[in-house]
């Protein structure tokens, strides 16, 4: 019986995804997020200036933080749900 239990524990550990995956917001709402694909371990928030008083905000996962420009402000971070 103990052998069977030990075998089940080992199989469970092997079958679980023990790798770390980042969780990033993909909307302004804090309860809605996405689990990032393997290799994308940063969260990003891009604010895109459309008109003098209108902005689009894009949130999600990335592997490399894009550079900001005159019309796009990029903020990257390395913790879960940090791209508020």
Swiss-Prot record:
It comes from the Eukaryota. One of its GO terms (molecular function) is toxin activity. GO terms for cellular component: extracellular region. Keywords: Cardiotoxin, Disulfide bond, G-protein coupled receptor impairing toxin, Secreted, Signal, Toxin. Pfam families: Toxin_cobra-type. SUPFAM superfamilies: Snake toxin-like. Disulfide bonds join 24-43, 36-61, 65-76, 77-82. Its main location: secreted. Residues 1-21 form the signal peptide. InterPro entries: Cytotoxin_Cobra, Snake_3FTx, Snake_toxin-like_sf, Snake_toxin_con_site, Toxin_cobra-type. The keyword Lyase does not apply. It is found in: Secreted. CDD domains: TFP_snake_toxin. Belongs to the three-finger toxin family. Short-chain subfamily. Aminergic toxin sub-subfamily. Negative results: does not affect blood coagulation and does not show significant hemolytic activity. Acts as a beta-blocker by binding to beta-1 and beta-2 adrenergic receptors (ADRB1 and ADRB2). It dose-dependently decreases the heart rate (bradycardia), whereas conventional cardiotoxins increases it. At 100 mg/kg, intraperitoneal injection into mice provokes labored breathing, impaired locomotion, lack of response to external stimuli, and death (after 30 minutes). This is Beta-cardiotoxin CTX21.
């Amino acid at each position: 019986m103990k052998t069977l239990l030990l075998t089940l524990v080992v199989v469970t550990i092997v079958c679980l995804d023990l790798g770390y995956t980042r969780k990033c917001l993909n909307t302004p709402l804090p309860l809605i997020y996405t689990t990032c694909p393997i290799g994308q371990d940063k969260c990003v928030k891009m604010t895109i200036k459309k008109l003098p008083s209108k902005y689009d905000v894009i949130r999600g996962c990335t592997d490399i933080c894009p550079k900001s420009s005159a019309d796009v402000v990029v903020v990257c971070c390395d913790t879960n749900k940090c791209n508020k």
